Design a protein with these regions (language model features):
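Alpha-helical transmembrane segments of multi-pass membrane transporters/permeases
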Residues: 68, 78-81, 135-162, 176-183
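Small-residue-rich hydrophobic transmembrane alpha-helices
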Residues: 32-89, 93, 126-145
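Interfacial/gating helices of multi-pass transporter permease domains
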Residues: 22-41, 107-113, 175-176, 180
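Short alpha-helical transmembrane segments in multi-pass integral membrane proteins
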Residues: 1-4, 58-124, 170-194
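Transmembrane alpha-helix boundary and packing residues in multipass membrane permease domains
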Residues: 4, 8, 19-20, 56, ...
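Helix-terminus/linker motif at the lipid-water interface of multi-pass membrane proteins
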Residues: 9, 13-31, 99-106, 162-173
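Alpha-helical transmembrane segments of multi-pass membrane transporters
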Residues: 91-92, 130, 144-173, 187-193
Length: 194
């Protein structure tokens, strides 16, 4: 169960790391990152859970010895992940409307929108990773999935430090740097798994 927990919680861990670094950067940034991260995660999860369901079918077809069907259902999960991008982008105004309804201070809301927008732009990477991960976990090959997600989280820590505070040759970008770091790090696991 541990590899599955690691794989499904990778984005949560990355957003938590964002908040750890942002807490040392600005009180406004830390106030903005949590609600924006949770809201984006809520929208992304519909697509991620659906694409990740490919792993269930991979397990069934793997048990039946039908490798071709394993590849086919994984491909469907990948297509769904890619198709989620325009929907996630279309949900950005709805997210902004919800943030306005909540009524946080204007400076917090401005940073919430920055973080939320980046999470939504890169949101398709989460279902992409879950679909690819489902191919391996459905065949009880969880080691690669686990290591890929750990690598993604490690990349996020380094990029958060560099992009939030302006270290390692990067400009100081605050909350936007944290969001960009998480989007980049979200691409690591799928790239390793491919």
């Amino acid at each position: 169960a541990t590899p599955l927990i690691i794989g499904s919680s990778a984005l949560t861990v990355m957003q938590f790391c964002d908040r750890l670094f942002l807490a040392r950067h600005s009180s406004v940034s830390i106030q903005a990152a949590l609600p924006a991260g949770i809201l984006s995660f809520t929208f992304i999860c519909l697509f991620a859970a659906t694409a990740g369901y490919a792993g269930t079918f991979v397990a069934q077809y793997h048990g039946a010895g039908d490798r071709r069907q394993c590849i086919r259902v994984t491909a469907q999960g990948l297509w769904l992940a890619l198709a989620s991008l325009p929907f996630l982008l279309l949900l950005i105004p709805a997210g902004h409307a919800l943030m306005t309804l909540i009524g946080h201070a204007p400076e917090v809301m401005a940073e919430e929108r920055i973080y939320f927008d980046w999470m939504m732009r890169g949101g398709f990477l989460v279902p992409l990773g879950w679909a690819i991960g489902g191919f391996f976990t459905g065949q009880s090959r969880m080691r690669l999935n686990t290591l890929a997600n750990i690598a993604g989280a490690a990349v996020n820590v380094v990029l958060d430090y560099a992009m939030i505070f302006g270290r390692l040759g990067c400009p100081a970008m605050g909350i936007e740097g944290g969001a960009i770091a998480t989007v980049i790090a979200s691409a690591v696991a799928p790239l390793i798994q491919i």
